[in-house]
């Protein structure tokens, strides 16, 4: 009896700490922050929750949790061999990703399905409301030809009047990727909602979010959203419609993804052309955004007015520099690994990885802080073993996703994997989560990967004889 009471106390203590950890991080990052400074005590708070999650993970025997634990062990081992201080601020960024996973991934499995449904619904509703309000402000600013800055609050929404792009963040790709993720989270909220009013509100929020996303002209988010849309249709077809054979079911996936990319890219760039203002370049040009004071800018002054083509322009997907200078960064990382092959096994010190890669980049490439590719960054920082651990976690997630899609599940369950797949595609051209900085996408990724894993394990238990 006492042992059962102790387990129950530990379980509820973990859930309280994990929920607080999630809400705290989402609350401090609801704004589109261009700085993701992790507070010193946050790592200690996460470690406490991680210990709880490992204790419960042993009982639940979640392969995802234990594989990621192996990743943390490998990072600690390599850091110890190099003589690094694992409490240093630079290392904190790297361990934040794995700690967040160990804290949040077991949470859905500790809650009953109905309770997790309510927990997820409430969390997404608050997040969607905050982000939709910011998207609405951005749309108003762009369509009216104004620009709104609020750097003091570490977020910024504005319209660069020179190239007709809406900047939701000083780092446009990061902000656009967050907006695309919010579109998919709102779609899950739509599936979770039961009333017609709530569903209508979700649709309206998605329209506002897509409008703001279109004005960012971020091709990464456009393409990743198309991949997620194609995967969504494929999952629904597999769950609701009988396919002639498994081969046909698998072959149709890349076709649907290609169609989704074309559709999303066409719709969003078309929306950009439709609603983007055609105004003269204003005082925003050639301004250091990171030092700009908070204020409200009006239209370009009469002295600066020039005649422009009435049709707004956007970048073509087949431009010669399709990846905005990332080719030079990726080549630098590959040259580093070629010049020092031993790094393929051990990886380089995480704080030194960027500096070492910059030494091998193409001349003229500006300095960068990471490899702009999560998988390449993992390879450089933690070697082939670290990359294999990351790929193993992703493979386990995809297997669990496939198991869910084979059974008749509620719509919201079938859609849980969409934001994760979306983010994994975005990671091909940036480092938003895991071994990069602690952005809101990191916490959603960990929570939803754990939710898919928990749902698949529940299905497995239901099939076992009583």
Predicted regions: what they are:
Residues 11-14, 64-72, 107-140, 198, ...:
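Interfacial loop-to-transmembrane-helix boundary motif in multi-pass membrane proteins
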Residues 121-154, 169-241, 396, 400, ...:
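Alpha-helical transmembrane segments of multi-pass inner-membrane proteins
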Residues 19, 229-232, 412-466:
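Transmembrane alpha-helices of multi-pass inner-membrane enzymes
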Residues 236-317, 335-339:
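A membrane-periplasm/extracellular boundary helix in multi-pass inner-membrane enzymes
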Residues 237-239, 243, 381-421:
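Hydrophobic transmembrane alpha-helices and their immediate junctions
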């Amino acid at each position: 009896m006492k042992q059962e009471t102790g387990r129950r106390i530990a379980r509820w203590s973990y859930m309280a700490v994990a929920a607080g950890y999630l809400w705290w991080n989402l609350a401090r990052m609801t704004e589109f922050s261009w700085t993701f400074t992790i507070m010193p005590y946050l790592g200690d708070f996460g470690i406490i929750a991680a210990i709880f999650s490992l204790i419960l993970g042993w009982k639940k025997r979640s392969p995802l949790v234990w594989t990621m634990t192996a990743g943390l062990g490998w990072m600690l081992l390599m850091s110890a061999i190099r003589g690094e201080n694992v409490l240093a601020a630079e290392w904190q960024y790297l361990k934040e990703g794995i700690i967040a996973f160990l804290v949040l991934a077991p949470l859905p499995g500790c809650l009953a399905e109905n309770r997790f449904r309510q927990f997820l619904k409430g969390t997404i509703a608050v997040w969607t409301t905050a982000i939709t309000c910011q998207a609405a402000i951005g749309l108003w600013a762009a369509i009216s030809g104004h620009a709104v800055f609020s750097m003091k609050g570490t977020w910024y929404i504005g319209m660069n009047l020179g190239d007709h792009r809406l900047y939701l963040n000083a780092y446009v790709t990061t902000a656009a990727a967050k907006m695309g993720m919010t579109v998919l989270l709102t779609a899950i909220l739509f599936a979770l909602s039961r009333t017609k009013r709530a569903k209508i509100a979700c649709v309206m929020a998605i329209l506002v979010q897509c409008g703001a996303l279109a004005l960012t002209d971020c091709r990464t988010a456009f393409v990743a959203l198309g991949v997620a849309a194609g995967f969504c249709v494929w999952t629904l077809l597999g769950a609701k419609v009988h396919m002639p054979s498994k081969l046909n079911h698998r072959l149709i996936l890349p076709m649907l993804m290609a169609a989704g990319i074309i559709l999303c890219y066409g719709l969003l760039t078309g929306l950009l052309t439709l609603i983007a203002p055609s105004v003269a370049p204003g005082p925003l040009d050639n301004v250091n955004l990171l030092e700009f004071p908070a204020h409200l800018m009006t239209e370009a002054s009469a002295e600066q007015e020039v005649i422009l083509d009435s049709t707004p322009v956007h970048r073509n997907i087949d431009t010669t520099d399709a990846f905005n200078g990332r080719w030079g960064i990726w080549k630098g990382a590959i040259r580093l690994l070629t010049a020092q092959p031993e790094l393929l096994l051990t990886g380089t010190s995480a704080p030194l990885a960027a500096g070492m890669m910059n030494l091998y980049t193409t001349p003229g490439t500006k300095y960068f802080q990471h490899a702009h590719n999560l998988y390449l960054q993992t390879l450089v920082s933690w070697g082939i073993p670290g990359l294999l651990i990351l790929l193993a976690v992703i493979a386990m997630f995809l297997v669990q996703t496939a198991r869910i899609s084979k059974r008749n599940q509620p719509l919201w369950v079938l859609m849980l994997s969409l934001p994760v797949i979306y983010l994994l595609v975005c990671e091909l051209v940036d480092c938003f989560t895991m071994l990069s900085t602690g952005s809101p996408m990191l916490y959603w990724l960990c929570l939803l990967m754990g939710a898919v894993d928990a749902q698949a394990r529940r299905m497995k238990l239901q099939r076992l004889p009583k």
